[in-house]
Amino acid sequence: MSEPRKILVTSALPYANGSIHLGHMLEYIQTDMWVRFQKLRGNQCIYVCADDAHGSAIMLRAEKEGITPEQLIANVQAEHCADFAEFLVDFDNFHSTHAEENRELSSQIYLKLRDAGHIATRSITQYFDPEKKMFLADRFIKGTCPKCGTEDQYGDNCEKCGATYAPTDLKDPKSAISGATPVLKDSQHFFFKLPDFQQMLQSWTRSGTLQDAVANKIAEWLDAGLQQWDISRDAPYFGFEIPDEPGKYFYVWLDAPIGYMASFKNLCSRRPELDFDAFWGKDSTAELYHFIGKDIVNFHALFWPAMLEGAGYRKPTGINVHGYLTVNGQKMSKSRGTFIKARTYLEHLSPEYLRYYYASKLGRGVDDLDLNLEDFVQKVNSDLVGKVVNIASRCAGFIHKGNAGVMVDSNAAPELTEAFLAAAPSIADAYEARDFARAMREIMGLADRANAWIADKAPWSLNKQEGKQDEVQAICATGIILFRQLVIFLKPVLPLLAADAEAFLNVAPLTWNDHQQLLANHQLNKFKPLMTRIDPVKVQAMTDASKEDLAASQTDTGGPKGNGELVKDPLSAEIDFDAFAAIDLRVALIVKAEAVEGADKLLRLTLDIGDEQRNVFSGIKSAYPDPSKLDGRLTMMIANLKPRKMKFGISEGMVMAAGPGGEEIYLLSPDSGAKPGQRIK
């Protein structure tokens, strides 16, 4: 028998500035299932994580709440730990980056990089808030877009026109923190010489450590040439001060991944059998895997391995990247109630429902995963309750009533039992490859075969026939044998179900190799329901509660703040989908635009909507004093609006525009390629 593998596993560190939501949970559940599988197989697998507890955002939120940053991160960590525990995410250690182990390791790694010549310094010019006495990151600067003139845009890109720019390009810049006009100021910054590791990274990222799609994306950055990475921030900043550089702090993304090492080192201090160097030393033979989302690939596949290489530590064995979570086919939305916090979910539904659904959809690629709430209900109810648990509930009663709960020593389906045993290597391979969806398909295929066999044998009918009781006991004992096999295969995904099944089966905690042994002449405990069906009403209550979370947060903050459009023009009352669906929006070509004699605000628009022309009066004259410039332009119109008789004629629809009025009216246009008459949906 081969020696157990030594494996260290991490998930990305959640930021200690907010609650965990179901998008976050995708990663932690994925990682936990893989770790549980390794432990079930007898491998030494250690799972560590920590809160990412540094940065300006945490400092500013703590200030706003009137508490210290240390108090804030302690409060958030308690919330995170409770959510993870109830979702059955079983960390060996959950630490914080604001810890002495992380301070020591961050300083040590920085000094090794500095002494090896991998740190550069140079002066950079940044905006500085004269009231808060702090340099401003791009997201803390707002102003007018230099390209389209839209107000209240961030310092690096415009949300309206999509333009990107430097903060110094903004017109009328303001500090988003104090509202003060920032001034430009020079500061010395420290840079990690990432280009020093170009050759190593080109080789390492193609060595099987990354999925092919991720390696291809990284290759684009490598081919474009790596740039030095700014690793410093100026005081005031919540983080670790750079050694020998008072007033200069490590950028949060330098000490965050070092938090993996710090969490493990903290665990080593409490578990003397663990050796830090055996897992992190340059010559370590242990396996090291990071599970992350695709949004932070560059930090983990470029900066992190280069830092480790430069400081004399080992590099990861693999970086396992997953996609984003969507809900009902769309980005999570607070207004739709699909931006669901972990705590909100737990208040309504069992964590194992979601664990199974994620497992059934998770492959080894980086595609996004959709949580379709209708499919979620159907799949869990059908697979777990209707297939797996159904086997035990069908068989247990006959064994208790007919043989005092003792399974007879009889296998009524040797070929089917052998098929279950033979499936174990393939299911194990799927788990190992993180292809949880394939593992679930194979397991549910076995469950289907077991249910079909039991239905064919129909012990409930046989039990009514004289002299068939021994056959009934043999059938039901075989059903329990098959159920036990399924429980073993599902244990990494459904640890609570497995524990309850172990109690019913009257066995010690099951391991993977237990699938090779069959129960015979074995006393069962009384059967209790192992899982109930999802009630769709509870799912609706969960989404309703998520909408209430949004309403509460807006109430807490007094609604939208600042000079944004929602303050000037609040959202209208909600409408249902049917009301929206009744509106027929179409692409329209402006054939001719002309002034209306005797009307100060109106233009007469002749619109082509494909197979017919419409006459529409629109109050946009103040913004378009030369209406001929609109000729030939595509716009959008409401095509099924009841014709309206006006002083100057009949208006057969309405064109769509934005803006407060006057000269600030902006006629909406579809993207290039749209054709007159096409429906907008």
From Swiss-Prot:
It is found in: Cytoplasm. Homodimer. ATP binds at residue 334. PROSITE patterns: AA_TRNA_LIGASE_I, TRBD. Zn(2+) binds at residues 145, 148, 158, 161. Its cofactor is Zn(2+). InterPro entries: aa-tRNA-synth_I_CS (IPR001412), Anticodon_Met (IPR041872), Met-tRNA-synth_bsu_C (IPR004495), Met-tRNA_ligase_1 (IPR023458), Met-tRNA_synth (IPR014758), Methionyl/Leucyl_tRNA_Synth (IPR015413), MetRS_core (IPR033911), MetRS_Zn (IPR029038). Keywords: Aminoacyl-tRNA synthetase, ATP-binding, Cytoplasm, Ligase, Metal-binding, Nucleotide-binding, Protein biosynthesis, RNA-binding, tRNA-binding, Zinc. This is Methionine--tRNA ligase. It is an enzyme of class 6 (ligase). Its EC number is 6.1.1.10. It comes from Pseudomonas fluorescens (strain ATCC BAA-477 / NRRL B-23932 / Pf-5). It catalyses: tRNA(Met) + L-methionine + ATP = L-methionyl-tRNA(Met) + AMP + diphosphate. Is required not only for elongation of protein synthesis but also for the initiation of all mRNA translation through initiator tRNA(fMet) aminoacylation. GO terms for molecular function: ATP binding; metal ion binding; methionine-tRNA ligase activity; tRNA binding.
